[in-house]
């Protein structure tokens, strides 16, 4: 069985109740390809998760944008994996570059978070990616492999994980890795999984692209053999997110 296309929408720290309800209405009214072809997840800020989950069409799932590395307790401001599971939130994004860079989350810490969230029954979108300086220094794969290794060393079951390659230099900048650049990193990352984890995990794990994906760029990116979907930022707040979801049809054409 092939890898089902996966499209995640990361709403980041955006929205009001009214804006979020408008986005949900747009998604509910949109014509999207069959759930047999694409798995869709949107990730609103924590405070809007119950609203979105209650009002969104059932075939679109929800994700949290982060969770704590262990069980809840005296960790002011944090949300535990157990809380998300209790709310019926199936997915969580971990290791996003904004958290790595702005909040100093290390690869080791992200690996611990991923392992803990999976152990609590959540599904995880684990993010990896290099900065512009690292790309220009020719160390893209070294960086991505190091970040992935920190996760791989802590988990055994990959069936509930998706890896999101997000070149940091292409996030929120309007710059997009060319389809060839994205395919190269995705293929190398799959090879790394094959060598360092197992051929089965490499073949079954979805590796999605996250770097200023738009309605204009999505189809050509989706056509790449090792691009199994997208983690979409700003465009997931706009009607063009429907077009990005429907790029999944490229895989089944």
From Swiss-Prot:
Main subcellular localisation: cytoplasm
Pathway, per record: Carbohydrate biosynthesis; gluconeogenesis; Carbohydrate degradation; glycolysis; D-glyceraldehyde 3-phosphate from glycerone phosphate: step 1/1
GO cellular component, one term: cytosol
Catalytic activity: D-glyceraldehyde 3-phosphate = dihydroxyacetone phosphate
Molecular functions (GO terms): triose-phosphate isomerase activity
Enzyme Commission code(s) on record: 5.3.1.1
SUPFAM superfamilies assigned: Triosephosphate isomerase (TIM)
GO biological process, one term: glycolytic process
Places the protein is found: Cytoplasm
PROSITE patterns xrefs: TIM_1, TIM_2
Protein family per UniProt: Belongs to the triosephosphate isomerase family.
Something else known: In plants, there are two types of TPIS, cytosolic and plastid.
Subunit structure: Homodimer.
The name this protein goes by in its record: Triosephosphate isomerase, cytosolic
Organism per entry: Hordeum vulgare (Barley)
């Amino acid at each position: 069985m092939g890898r089902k296309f996966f499209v995640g929408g990361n709403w980041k720290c955006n929205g009001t109740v009214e804006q979020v309800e408008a986005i949900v209405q747009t998604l509910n009214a949109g014509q999207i390809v069959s759930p047999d072809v694409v798995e869709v997840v949107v990730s609103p800020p924590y405070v809007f998760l119950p609203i979105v989950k209650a009002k969104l069409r059932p075939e679109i799932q929800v994700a949290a944008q982060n969770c704590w590395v262990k069980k809840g307790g005296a960790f002011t401001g944090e949300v535990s994996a157990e809380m998300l599971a209790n709310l019926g939130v199936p997915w969580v994004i971990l290791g996003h570059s904004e958290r790595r860079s702005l909040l100093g989350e290390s690869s080791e810490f992200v690996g611990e978070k991923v392992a803990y969230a999976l152990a609590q029954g959540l599904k995880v979108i684990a993010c990896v990616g290099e900065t512009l300086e690292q790309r220009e220094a020719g160390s893209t794969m070294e960086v991505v492999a190091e970040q992935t290794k920190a996760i791989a060393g802590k988990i055994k079951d990959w069936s509930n994980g998706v890896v999101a390659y997000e070149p940091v230099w292409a996030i929120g900048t309007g710059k997009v890795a060319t389809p060839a650049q994205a395919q190269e990193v995705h293929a190398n990352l799959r090879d790394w999984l094959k060598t360092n984890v197992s051929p089965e995990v490499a073949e079954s794990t979805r590796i999605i692209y996250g770097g200023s994906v738009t309605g204009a760029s999505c189809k050509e990116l989706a056509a790449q053999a090792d691009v199994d979907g997208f983690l979409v930022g700003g465009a997931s707040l706009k009607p063009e997110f429907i077009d990005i979801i429907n790029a999944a049809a490229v895989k089944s054409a």
